């Protein structure tokens, strides 16, 4: 597998996602922008949309997470594309949505399995795999977290999780909030990685990164920052998770 930790940050993971600017002002601006985004982007969630990410086209169907409305999808895809995976790599894309990260991984890896709990997202990701000519190296499965890949191990796991704590209101809201995703994902990572494998998880300063980082360490995962990007009201970071040999807390 390609070395995806070549550009580790010197800062501690907990420091990376400190919101830019004054915290109170940042939260206020973020809430205002969130309202505007929901109002102006509603049609892009409720209708069929054709979006372009790094030169590739993606059909986004209703109730499926749109990779162009938040910044996360394009940021993660850009990282995957610029750190090309080894040709023999086997990859799991957790919570694939429209399939953006899975498809960019499948352009280079030998095999990609994508998983989503939203049945509409599963159908959407399959369409996009065919649209981008990687259906022969990718498979999309329906189910919750690691359930569809029980007993399987991968060189790399990708995850752009719901950042917010709470009960999702509908299928689309599952991409934004969950009460226990940090705990359940962290508990299952080790059992689904091959020796020498790693997971990449994208988190935002808008969400509660603390519970994720705490759970990763509690489950004996070494956490390092491999990419970060700052915006006016938000910071994004990609964290690399590696199981510690003794399984102890990091």
Regions found by a protein language model. Give the residues of each.
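Conserved SAM/SAH cofactor-binding pocket of Class I
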Residues: 77-166
């Amino acid at each position: 597998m390609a070395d995806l930790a070549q550009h580790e940050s010197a800062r501690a993971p907990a420091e990376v996602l400190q919101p830019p600017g004054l915290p109170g002002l940042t939260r206020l601006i973020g809430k205002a922008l969130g309202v505007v985004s929901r109002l102006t982007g509603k049609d892009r969630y409720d209708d069929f949309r054709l979006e372009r990410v790094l030169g590739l086209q993606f059909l986004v169907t209703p109730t499926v997470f749109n990779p162009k409305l938040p910044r996360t999808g394009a940021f993660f895809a850009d990282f995957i594309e610029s750190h090309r995976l080894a040709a023999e790599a086997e990859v799991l894309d957790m919570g694939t949505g429209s399939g953006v990260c899975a498809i960019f991984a499948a352009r280079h890896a030998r095999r990609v399995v994508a998983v989503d709990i939203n049945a509409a997202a599963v159908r959407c990701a399959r369409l996009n795999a065919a649209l981008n000519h990687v259906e022969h190296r990718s498979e999309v499965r329906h189910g919750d977290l690691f359930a569809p890949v029980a007993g399987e191990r991968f060189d790399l796991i990708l995850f752009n999780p719901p950042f917010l704590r709470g009960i999702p209101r509908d299928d689309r809201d599952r991409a934004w909030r969950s009460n226990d995703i940090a705990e359940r994902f962290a508990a299952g990572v080790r059992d689904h990685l091959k020796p020498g494998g790693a997971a990449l998880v994208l988190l935002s300063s808008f969400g509660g990164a603390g519970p994720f980082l705490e759970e990763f360490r509690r489950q004996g995962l070494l956490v390092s920052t491999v990419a970060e990007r700052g915006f006016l009201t938000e910071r994004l970071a990609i964290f690399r998770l590696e199981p510690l040999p003794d399984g102890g807390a990091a």
